[in-house]
Amino acid sequence: MDTVVTKIELNLKPFSRGKVRDTYELAEGKLLMVASDRLSAFDVVFPEGIEKKGQVLTQMSLFWFERLKGIVDNHLISTMVPDGLPSYLEGRCMTVKKVRIIPIECVVRGYMAGSGWKDYQKTGAICGIKLPAGLKNASKLPQPIFTPSTKADKGLSLIHI
């Protein structure tokens, strides 16, 4: 059985720590991004993790980087574990170019839930997208909607774009 990886300790200079990913400085303008198995919801990181979540998140990122190749550039250099680092990083790390990011969170909603439900109750819309009257919490939406927002730091409110 694999171990749930919620704490990542490397002998590298930390660059940033998010709710799920930790990023470390490498040489020559490169960073090492590591996806942990930490679980977060509604701005809370829970003490228990989900086994292999980091590998799944990394594979999802790689899928989209490949799918969007030729359409939009990305920062990916390699998915190999750098020499001298622990084997538990296999499948959960990416060496990337250090770039200026555009902090946008892209959400596709298929169901009326969470902050979308709260918005709908107040305005009949989610992120300015008018929806039919009479929907209930957890209702399936007539069609998925795209609701991008700024990616807020912990404790700050996001802004719908």
What kind of region is each of these model predictions?
Residues 2-152:
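Active-site loop/lid in soluble adenylation, ligation, and acyl-transfer enzymes
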